[in-house]
Amino acid sequence: MASTRSIELEHFEERDKRPRPGSRRGAPSSSGGSSISGPKGNGLIPSPAHSAHCSFYRTRTLQALSSEKKAKKARFYRNGDRYFKGLVFAISNDRFRSFDALLIELTRSLSDNVNLPQGVRTIYTIDGSRKVTSLDELLEGESYVCASNEPFRKVDYTKNVNPNWSVNIKGGTTRTLAVASAKSEVKESKDFIKPKLVTVIRSGVKPRKAVRILLNKKTAHSFEQVLTDITEAIKLDSGVVKRLCTLDGKQVTCLQDFFGDDDVFIACGPEKYRYAQDDFVLDHSECRVLKSSYSRASAAKYSGSRSPGFSRRSKSPASVNGTPSSQLSTPKSTKSSSSSPTSPGSFRGLKQISAQGRSSSNVNGGPELDRCLSPEGVNGNRCSESFPLLEKYRIGKVIGDGNFAVVKECVDRYTGKEFALKIIDKAKCCGKEHLIENEVSILRRVKHPNIIMLVEEMETATDLFLVMELVKGGDLFDAITSSTKYTERDGSAMVYNLANALRYLHSLSIVHRDIKPENLLVCEYPDGTKSLKLGDFGLATVVEGPLYTVCGTPTYVAPEIIAETGYGLKVDVWAAGVITYILLCGFPPFRSENNLQEDLFDQILAGKLEFPAPYWDNITDSAKELISQMLQVNVEARCTAGEILSHPWVSDDASQENNMQAEVTGKLKQHFNNALPKQNSTTTGVSVIMNTALDKEGQIFCSKLCQDSSRPSREQTSPVPPSAQEAPPPLESPRPPGPPATSGCDLAGTWRRHRD
């Protein structure tokens, strides 16, 4: 009984025992009778607290006592950690006798080697406006930020969490804003989200953890939320997941990237991502584990749309078609070996597996990725040295596949500018490496606005990687046939661009030897202007003396090449003269009526130049004069590229403005109708890049009698059967004007003239 009294002393006080006036028991009444005064005298029942058996009474109500003993729930975040969802604590006077005790418990729960290594020493309000210094300042349902000695870092801590335990918080808080923003995100189109199983491998030293993730509309609400959940599941040593990369090295930047063709991702922390060789190695047993995972993942994709999705905050392991799978928001389930197979993942092994079930038309090029950009290399050999290239460029699908090279989409990660990645298989160049070496050495030297530029190169033991400028405007013929207006002045500007490129090359003693319309690409600039760019340097070489190799395309080959008397830089001027002639009338100056190459060569050697009516009636004499100077059989009398630029028809705008688009286009289609049409304007630029020096072997022949070997380069670059390659080549240019690349494009006044 004494112990009971001591416990209740804090809630009761001693009653004042002073007697009330006239309340003495048994006192005689004024009437002389014995009567009971006080409450009984008034007919009231005395309270037990005021009875003689209890000398104490309550000073606070039971409701107030219950409220004081009830624990207050509050959520605590780490200072500056935007990926941490917060930790809920129940705070009561029984559990924490002092504020320091709370700090000790928060340190034990929130501090580690990465986060708050000095422990929790300060608690801020969620907006950082003030510090909390006592337990009484902590309010029910509120959120707070824990820090060491550093100042408060302003972060939207409530962005990735919507506490459902807060029952007393009214509207107008930061949490309300977070919910409102979340609702606005839901309104955005999420049609690309389909049930999909992906594998996430954490970066770092081996053995590396790999977890399988199910993504659907219930588990993938936003990119930030998925990153947060991956952080919980993968548990990086360096802290939060800062970046996710595909096996190609492409960084995942939005939610939609998870639902592309990539199934495996590498989780990276704050450290700089390394494309080390060890990161790309898997042994056979690990490959088998991942291969089985992919087979199960494909089954999950098929049935995922019919099965109910997992809850984003599920607390129990989930399974797909009977196969245990780790859930992003369930860290406990990720620890089991069945739900998160732990294996030292590598890019090579994973890519081999993932490519087996993909078509070659996927965004990464399907099996072509294994051949060209995976560490396996083109021939299955390791070429992990190529991956620093991926740090700067994002590699896309295959856009061109030739006999010796593959061309892929290539985008600069920092500027967003598009390029073309040319990948040459060294195994196919065995014994002829000097040809490729010569071509690349020339590309390294040339830098001119009218020449397709080599941006960057990289070489491995098995492959040669060339980042090339990508020109999408079609070729020279496309510029004419796709326009609504084509004048003599436009032709003059085209010749200026070509002569400008030739003057630069010849100043370096470089001869191109394959000047033709399909190697002249139209570059379109943002301001609407255009210029020509010369490409395909497979036959180019440095002139150190007379050359005797008979090569080129028959329509544009110079007479000294056919005669085998030795030639030099001016063979390019002859080819430019043929192109100028075609630009103004639509047909070549030398042609065979019987379609015989020997007749064509005889006409070229004779050099008899005519300007037949009525096709040349409206062409200025200045243009005819320039063409005559360019098509001189006598090399000494032939003009140079510099003289072309200084000619009045080119430099002084002596050309006319009459529209001759219909006439020239009609003749082009009549005389250049024997090559395959391209699908779009980009195809032409890719074909030029795809050509290599090895593709030019068909354009090298010993004499004019060896007619079967001068197959045009355009047809050589496509995979044609050997029997087809031996067919006699056509006499006209191998590139006809295909379908218009664009419609309604007016060329008048839009051609650039780059001045050196």
Swiss-Prot record:
Q: Where is the composition biased (Polar residues)?
A: 353-364
Question: What is the top-level taxon of the source organism?
Answer: Eukaryota
Give the gene name: Dclk2
Sites where Phosphoserine occurs are at S361, S646
Outline the subunit composition.
Binds to and stabilizes microtubules. Interacts with MAPK8IP1/JIP-1, MAPK8IP2/JIP-2, MAPK9/JNK2, PPP1R9B/NEURABIN-2 and actin.
Q: What ranges does the record list as Basic and acidic residues composition bias? A: 7-19
**According to its UniProt record, which protein family does this protein belong to?**
Belongs to the protein kinase superfamily. CAMK Ser/Thr protein kinase family. CaMK subfamily.
Modification type Phosphothreonine: residues: T61, T665
Q: Bias regions of kind Pro residues — which residues?
A: 719-740
Q: Give the Gene Ontology MF terms in alphabetical order.
A: ATP binding; microtubule binding; protein kinase activity; protein serine kinase activity; protein serine/threonine kinase activity
Query: Where do the annotations place ATP binding?
Result: I399, G400, D401, G402, N403, F404, A405, V406, V407, K422
> Coiled-coil stretches, from where to where?
none
Naturally occurring in which organism (per UniProt):
Mus musculus
Name the catalysed reactions.
Answer: L-seryl-[protein] + ATP = O-phospho-L-seryl-[protein] + ADP + H(+); L-threonyl-[protein] + ATP = O-phospho-L-threonyl-[protein] + ADP + H(+)
- Copy the domain comment: The doublecortin domains are involved in the colocalization with microtubules.
Q: How is it modified after translation?
A: Autophosphorylated.
What's the name of the protein?
Serine/threonine-protein kinase DCLK2
Question: What InterPro entries does the record tag this protein with?
Answer: Doublecortin_dom, Doublecortin_dom_sf, Kinase-like_dom_sf, Prot_kinase_dom, Protein_kinase_ATP_BS, Ser/Thr_kinase_AS
Region annotation Disordered: where it falls in the sequence: 1-44, 301-375, 707-756
Q: In which tissues is it expressed?
A: Expressed in the central and peripheral nervous system including the brain, spinal cord, cranial and dorsal root ganglia and in the parasympathetic ganglia. Present in neurons, but not in glial cells, in most forebrain areas. Strong expression in the hippocampal CA1 pyramidal cell layer. Expressed in the photoreceptor sensory cilium complex and in eyes. Also detected in individual cells of the olfactory epithelium.
Q: Where is the composition biased (Low complexity)?
A: 24-43, 301-311, 323-346
Pfam families for this protein: DCX, Pkinase
Give all residue intervals belonging to the Doublecortin domain.
Answer: 72-158, 196-279
Effects seen without this gene: Frequent spontaneous seizures that originate in the hippocampus, with most animals dying in the first few months of life.
Q: Can you quote a single GO CC term?
A: cytoskeleton
